[in-house]
């Protein structure tokens, strides 16, 4: 019989308070009004979303705000089948990169509003290039999940 | 360019579920194995480099204190390096820089992880900030599944072909691991076992995914003068590269993946390699997921873009192929994360010094070791050769 080796249980619980900063604060206020806000880089002219304080490529401040389209195309996707620690959404769910119309980077979010019971039925409806639009929750908290998901059109 | 640097030996623990000993004792097991392999003593070591995953994996934040006695670092300078999955490669490169700079002649480099003590996927989720990326990425499988899907969609590779190639990689590596005494998961699987396994995150199934492993690895880096004096067959560091992506996950293309290609370019330039598929004899790719290994064949210039599945199915990267990849079984069979990329370096060095045992690639003279980490954010490479 294999020898039993004992272990000792120890849990770590640590609270944190993250500073939001003025740019994300405005972005979250936009979500409460059902607006998706990005900003335009004055150097490369790209529109990046979510809004951020500076362009990562050009390393210059971005002060010009743009309300971007709530429709776009799926760039890539996966279906989460296993629950993960601290996740706000129960599996199965579809995580995806979405290129909103007129923007120059991909937004990470969920695709939903379709039958998620089988990967094969999902693969018929969700592909690279599938058009999707934002579906909003009735109650807003100023959080990315104020957009419940992006639904295939 | 700094001084010439060699790897004079290494040690690994038996990887797997190791609740038979404490974490520091696991670290010591690798250190002692490296001392036996090289014939040196701790008195010969000028400095120690140590690293793990982020502290949430360990449950102890200050690991170089926790491991101080096990590492033999008391009374010596110690450096800690941590870059998530790339940690082991960053450790190796830290050791290399230290010796190349001339500030040390012999450096002990140690990576470790005891993944069964914590919750690896919970730790992986804390690698992401909680408000934008974390809710959508489900630890590592979500990230790599999306990257794999993006790759197949970019080149219109039929799903059946990708599935077949990924299954072959899984079957081959789980069998390769049977010849590696340190490997964690050693299995004889069929193609159907892999293709019909439980879904983790579509399209990734159970045998496409690496395990949680407990394990440690120690590698000794030395100056040319020391290496020639005490080691019959050193593995000479011929090239290295490291490159990272931005934080924002949707900002860059992860298929024609700039940071992987750039890391390889840096390493090939330094090593004088122009045709990696022909010139390299063996590669230890950081392959926590089958699809990730396929993608890297293209990023590293082994296969033309969109052709990795065809080349894999033709056997190019199998043990008896043109460029054997992960003959140790790779990350897919053994993943104590803080040690994992350092194991790639140790395995590459074993191959070019003819010490890889039952998974030795005959006559291997030039080998590539790879580390991948962050949220698909970092790539690092070290190339080692039998000739100084």
What would you call each of these model-derived segments?
Chain B
Residues 1-24, 33, 130, 154, ...:
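Condensing-enzyme catalytic core mediating Claisen C-C bond formation in acyl metabolism
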Residues 1-86, 94, 151-165, 184-190, ...:
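Conserved active-site "lid/cap" helical segment
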Residues 2-3, 18, 54-110, 114-144, ...:
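Conserved catalytic cysteine-centered active-site region
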Residues 7, 42-52, 77-83, 107-111, ...:
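Beta-strand segments within the central parallel beta-sheet cores of soluble alpha/beta enzyme folds
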Residues 55-63, 249-253, 286-310, 338, ...:
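Short glycine/threonine-rich loop-to-helix capping motif typified by GTGT followed
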Residues 82-113, 141-179, 219-225, 333-356:
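Active-site-proximal alpha-helical scaffold in enzymes
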Residues 257-261, 265-291, 299-302, 332-337:
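Extended C-terminal subregions enriched in glycine
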Residues 338-388:
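C-terminal amphipathic "assembly/sorting" segment characterized by alternating charged
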């Amino acid at each position: 019989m294999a020898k039993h080796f004992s272990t000792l249980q120890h849990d770590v619980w640590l609270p944190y308070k993250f500073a939001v900063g003025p740019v994300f604060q405005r972005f979250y206020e936009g979500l409460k009004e059902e607006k998706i806000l990005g900003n335009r880089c004055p150097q490369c002219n790209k529109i990046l979303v979510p809004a951020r304080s500076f362009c990562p490529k050009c390393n210059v401040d971005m002060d010009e705000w743009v309300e971007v389209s709530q429709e776009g195309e799926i760039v890539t996707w996966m279906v989460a089948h296993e629950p993960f620690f601290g996740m706000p959404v129960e599996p199965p769910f579809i995580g995806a990169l979405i290129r909103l119309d007129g923007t120059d980077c991909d937004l990470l979010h969920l695709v939903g509003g379709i039958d998620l019971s089988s990967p094969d039925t999902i693969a018929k409806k969700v592909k690279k290039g599938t058009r999707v639009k934002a579906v909003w929750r009735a109650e807003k908290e100023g959080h990315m999940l104020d957009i419940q998901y992006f639904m295939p059109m | 360019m700094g001084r010439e640097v060699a790897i004079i030996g290494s040690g690994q623990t038996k990887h797997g579920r190791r609740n038979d000993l404490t974490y520091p004792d696991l670290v010591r097991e690798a250190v002692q194995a490296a001392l036996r392999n090289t014939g040196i003593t701790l008195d010969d070591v000028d400095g120690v480099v140590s690293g793990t995953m982020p502290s949430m994996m360990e449950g102890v934040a200050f690991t170089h204190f926790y491991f101080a006695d096990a590492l033999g670092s008391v009374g010596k300078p110690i450096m800690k390096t941590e870059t998530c999955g790339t940690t082991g490669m960053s450790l190796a490169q830290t050791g290399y820089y230290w010796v190349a700079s001339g500030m040390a002649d012999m450096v002990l480099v140690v990576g470790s992880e005891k993944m069964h003590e914590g919750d690896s996927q919970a730790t992986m989720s804390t690698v992401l900030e909680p408000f934008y990326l974390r809710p959508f990425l489900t630890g590592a499988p979500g990230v790599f599944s999306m990257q794999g899907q993006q790759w197949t969609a970019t080149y219109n590779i039929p799903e059946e072909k990708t599935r077949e190639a990924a299954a072959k990689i899984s079957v081959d590596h789980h069998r390769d691991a049977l010849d590696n005494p340190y490997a964690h998961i050693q299995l004889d699987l069929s193609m159907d076992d892999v293709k019909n396994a439980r879904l983790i995150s579509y399209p990734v199934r159970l045998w496409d995914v690496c395990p949680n492993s407990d394990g440690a690895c120690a590698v000794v880096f030395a100056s040319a003068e020391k290496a020639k004096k005490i080691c019959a067959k050193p593995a000479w560091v011929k090239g290295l590269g490291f490159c990272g992506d931005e934080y924002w996950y949707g900002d860059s293309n992860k298929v024609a993946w700039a940071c992987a290609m750039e890391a390889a370019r840096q390493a090939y330039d330094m090593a004088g390699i122009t045709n990696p598929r022909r010139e390299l004899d063996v590669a230890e790719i950081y392959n926590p997921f089958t699809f990730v290994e396929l993608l890297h064949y293209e990023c590293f210039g082994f296969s033309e873009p969109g052709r990795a599945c065809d080349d894999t199915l033709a056997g190019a990267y199998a043990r008896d192929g043109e460029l054997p990849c992960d003959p140790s079984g790779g990350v897919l069979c053994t993943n104590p994360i803080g040690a994992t990329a350092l194991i790639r370096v140790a395995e590459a060095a074993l191959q070019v010094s003819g010490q890889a045992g039952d998974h030795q690639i005959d006559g291997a003279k030039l080998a590539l070791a790879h580390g991948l980490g962050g949220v698909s954010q970092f790539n690092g490479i070290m190339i080692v050769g039998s000739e100084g």
